[in-house]
Every structure is written in C-alpha cells, then in structure tokens.
Curated annotation (Swiss-Prot):
Superkingdom assignment: Bacteria
Keyword Electron transport listed: yes
Organism: Novispirillum itersonii (Aquaspirillum itersonii)
Residue intervals passing through the bilayer: none
InterPro entries: Cyt_c-like_dom (IPR009056), Cyt_c-like_dom_sf (IPR036909), Cyt_c_1A/1B (IPR002327)
Transport among keywords: yes
Single Gene Ontology MF annotation: electron transfer activity
This protein's name: Cytochrome c-550
PTM field: Binds 1 heme c group covalently per subunit.
Binding site for heme c: C13, C16, H17, M90
Organism placement in taxonomy: Bacteria, Pseudomonadati, Pseudomonadota, Alphaproteobacteria, Rhodospirillales
Keywords assigned by UniProt, alphabetized: Electron transport, Heme, Iron, Metal-binding, Transport
Amino acid sequence: GDAAKGANVAKSCGTCHSFEQGGAKKQGPNLFGITTRGPGKAEGFNYSPSYKAAAAKGFAWDAATLQDYITDPTAFLSNKTGDAAARDKMTFKLAKPDERADVIAYLATLK
C-alpha cells in the first residue's frame, strides 16, 4: 500500500478517530500506534463488550488482521469470538482492496 494515499483515505475516518500521538478519543479510539499496541489498549477508550471478548482471545494488529477488520468489523468480531451476534461501535467498511492496503500502510507509519 501507499501510505500517502492512505493518509488521504483515512481523512474519512477522522470523523470517529484521531491519528496523532496523544490525540483525543472520539466515537472510536485514537489510532496512533495501533500497529505497536495490543487490541483494546487505546488509553481511556471504552470498547464494546464484543471487542473486549475478541481482544481477550488474543491477536495483534498486523497487516492481515487490520485487513480483515476494516473489510468488515462485525464479521471480524463474530469470527474472533464465535458469537454471530457480536457487534462493535465501528460499522464503517472499506470496500476497495487498494484503499484498505493504503490505509494499513498509513497506520503502520503512526508510531
């Protein structure tokens, strides 16, 4: 992916997320450092019960996991938890594979 293009695509995510170190929590957690911290570790953010259950199963925010999550957050949580009713606050999906790759490349620079 192209991190510069990803920064542009991620602007649409800025409604719910911040991207700078120490950035405010919004509807979604601050994504600064997401690839270097464990799931559910954004300071001060109240994660959904389904997200907490998935995080308890253990995973890392590597490129493949981010790809699965931003493709369909609800399906990701259902698969991780084994609960078809699992839901998250994030319902936005990035449909285009190239945009997902670009956003993932951008997120990897935030550390």
